């Protein structure tokens, strides 16, 4: 067990599309170390002339499926995963020429997004929310863990938590408070979805 916050779970792989992602460092320094993998879209496309973004998503799915996970948790993943990924992990499509990588039960995929449902979807959510607060348009934002679907940040929320803005607070201070909430609810949401897949 390498996840004290989730005693009945084990992280089988930390995969990143950013070489400098801190998650890769933390995984490598874990005792025992957690396996890691890195694959950036740009690198993949350079190494595979003629390949497409969907081919990349398929390759990411293959990396994930080799680990036979019960859940995929996206936290800090900075690439929008399309149907090339989603159809393979939810079983709508099979991996060509490799039955071992094909799933019989859908693997849930959840994502951490630093905003409330239907507010500030996509990248830069914290900055856009803070700017709206500065303009007096909102008094709070929040964090959600949602199921991943084709449309960005539109999947069904698993957990939503409101985080109020504080007058005079810098964006860095707000972001620090927001991250504390993220760390708490990512564990709760992972546990909740795992219990749906593999009840104790």
What residues fall within each predicted segment?
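One-carbon transfer enzymes
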Residues: 1-200
């Amino acid at each position: 067990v390498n996840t004290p916050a989730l005693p009945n779970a084990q992280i089988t792989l930390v995969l990143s599309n950013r070489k400098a992602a801190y998650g890769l460092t933390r995984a490598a320094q874990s005792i025992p170390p957690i396996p890691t993998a890195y694959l950036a879209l740009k690198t993949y496309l350079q190494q595979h002339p003629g390949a497409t973004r969907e081919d990349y998503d398929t390759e990411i799915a293959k990396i994930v499926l080799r680990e036979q996970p019960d859940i995929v948790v996206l936290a800090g993943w900075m690439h929008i995963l399309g149907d090339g990924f989603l159809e393979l992990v939810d079983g709508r499509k099979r991996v060509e020429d490799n039955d071992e990588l094909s799933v019989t039960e859908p693997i849930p995929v959840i994502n951490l997004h630093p905003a409330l449902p239907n507010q500030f979807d996509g990248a830069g959510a914290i900055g856009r929310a803070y700017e709206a607060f500065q303009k007096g348009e909102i008094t709070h934002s929040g964090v959600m863990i949602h199921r991943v679907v084709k449309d960005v940040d539109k999947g069904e929320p698993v957990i939503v938590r409101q985080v109020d803005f504080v007058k005079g607070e810098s964006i860095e201070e707000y972001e620090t408070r927001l991250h504390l909430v993220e760390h708490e609810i990512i564990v709760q949401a992972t546990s909740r979805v795992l219990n749906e897949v593999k009840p104790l």
